[in-house]
Amino acid sequence: MKLVEMLKSELPEYSIKIPSIDNDLLFRPFLVKEEKTLLLVSEEGNMTDILRTVKNILESCFTDLDLSSITLAEAEYLFLKLREKSVGEKLELMYKDTGSSMPYPITVELNKVKVPKRTKKLNDSISITEKINITLSDITLNDVIKENVQIYNPTQDDIIKILSIMIKTINVGEETLTGSDISIKEKIDFIENMTEKQLEKILTFYTNAPSLDHKFTHTINDEEKEFELKGLNDFFGLVSLT
């Protein structure tokens, strides 16, 4: 047996549970070469490239993981749990205080990050008019990469694009159009021609979607400060106060 094959055969295996999947997911730690690739991409700062690398690592480390069947937030959570088992429970981030030129290191305990869940149960079927009904689904990591959409700190245009991606079907009378049958541009035009009240129905589903959200406190110069991390992007750089 070759040395590399021997190493791989001795890798530990872990299990984890998320809401979208009934069975436990099995995974191995990521390897040095995989971490190196992620670090190199992270230094360049392009979030789409970072997420594409995260996707590749997740698919390599997890057994039978279908990223199109779980929410973006769940994929982000799985990556944090993977990092926890691969490197350690503590993650050091930098916080830059107002009026200070030097950032402070702060420690995040990854084992305390909770699995993302929808804030409240909502109907995914929404009536836009008496004749038009749509069904929505939560955005996935695959969606974000495929459509190259800015999911972190989105502009108004980004949010409309995200909403268009979330449209699963459009029912007009007895005719049903699936989201894949309609281009993103057509769905964006569809949303932009809604009234504010119609748009609000879709926004409610979006704003209550599962999200990776972690609140914690850290003492800096004898003062306890409260922080909040939202989305995987916050776990890659500077953090701010809540």
Language model features with spans:
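Long C-terminal interaction/binding lobes of large macromolecular proteins
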Residues: 1-242
